[in-house]
Design a protein with these regions (language model features):
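Hydrophobic/aromatic beta-strand elements that line small-molecule binding cavities or substrate pockets
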Residues: 59-60, 84-88
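An acidic, glycine-rich "communication" segment
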Residues: 1-79
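Extracellular ligand-binding/catalytic regions of CAZymes and related secreted enzymes
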Residues: 16, 77-81, 89-126
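A broad, low-specificity signal marking well-ordered, structured residues that form hydrophobic/aromatic
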Residues: 68-70, 84, 96-97
Length: 126
């Protein structure tokens, strides 16, 4: 139930973060993370050593809205690739960096931590 005085915002995912969440593949699958062709030269991926793997659950986010640019994709054997990191500029002009990664094991990987640092710096124009 929604809190009193609040309405449901069914398009929040697409309108604010530029996503399209529609479930996940489940736990226990190994996921390979690599750059997309459109994101390979983006500054957020500077010094991010790719590919890397994660035990994280792969979220289904395809297709992303046209305002979003996928930077990284996750690949699980026998499943379609899914975007796992992207940028978006929402309708109010806000710059968004999003990643569905964040399993506790991801934080042990220098590549993931560099991705987060770069994404934050990009959002604040540093």
């Amino acid at each position: 139930a929604l809190p009193a005085g609040h309405q449901e915002w069914t398009k929040w995912d697409s309108e604010v973060i530029g996503g399209n969440y529609n479930g996940h593949l489940g736990k226990g699958l190994s996921c390979k993370i690599q750059s997309t062709s459109g994101g390979v030269n983006h500054e957020i991926l500077n010094k991010v050593k790719l590919p890397f793997s994660t035990p994280a659950t792969l979220y289904r986010n395809s297709p992303l809205p046209s305002s979003s640019l996928a930077l990284l994709t996750g690949i699980v054997e026998n499943h379609a690739p899914e975007p796992v990191a992207w940028i978006n500029q929402n309708s109010s002009g806000g710059k968004v960096f999003y990643t569905s990664l964040g399993h506790v094991e991801d934080f042990k990987k220098p590549a993931f931590n560099q991705l987060l640092k770069n994404g934050i710096n990009w959002c604040i124009d540093q």
